[in-house]
Amino acid sequence: MLSINNFIELKENLEILLAEQNLSHELISGLHDQVEHTLIMAANEAIIDRHPGWILCEGRRAAELYLCRNWRRGGQLEDEKTRLRVLAEQMRKDFIAAQNERIDLRPLERIMRDLDEQNHFTAKVLGEEPLLILSAGCSHRCFSALCRPYIYQDDSFSCDIYLFQRTAEDHGTSWGSILLHELGHVLNLRLTGDISAAPDDFLSFAEPFFPGLSTKYRTSAPEFFAHCFAMGVASRPGLERYDAFLNIQNEHKQLFDAYMRSKIAQL
């Protein structure tokens, strides 16, 4: 039913679908079945590839998984149309045409596998649902990447990470570093249950390095946590090319890596 290669084309397809005069509940159900099947197939392939906790993809599959995760089924035809209309409108506000930057997913897959080998990241940090890492194939009006959390009634969670194409002026930071930053948000959510907070012991640990973090800059602590996770992991042998914090002493980066390793090990 869908003929799409990125999030922008997904929005356009939804708008065309919603404009149809004879749109039926059966057609909408068929669309949902299609994207749900895509998620099942992607999850099965991840199991075969020995990384059941995360799915990394681009193109049509990424767009269909975005729709599947952000579309909550239920209700009559008008209820379904309203949900899809709200989603399409939000996409119109957030996403803009591609900047012709191709995101190479191979280094990102290597990072995920390294974290699993070194820290059992998938088993200890991720929720029961797979982490979706989706290359949007378009740009966002404000961000190069986003971590989208889902908190469920039983206090469990899952996350998606969206990667957006950037303008040429914004290419200074590697995609590996950007992914590590977003994974820092995922770890923070696992530790605190609140992506807008940071662990109390992180505030005391990081205060000597970032004076005022626990007081004046406390609201920025979650971003500092994600930065510190990224720079800690990037201090490891073989991952130095993802280091976006060249002005910080390597010994300090390694201290933060040790802190993050200990937090993961305790989970």
Regions found by a protein language model. Name each.
Residues 3-19, 23-267:
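Active-site-flanking segments in enzyme catalytic domains
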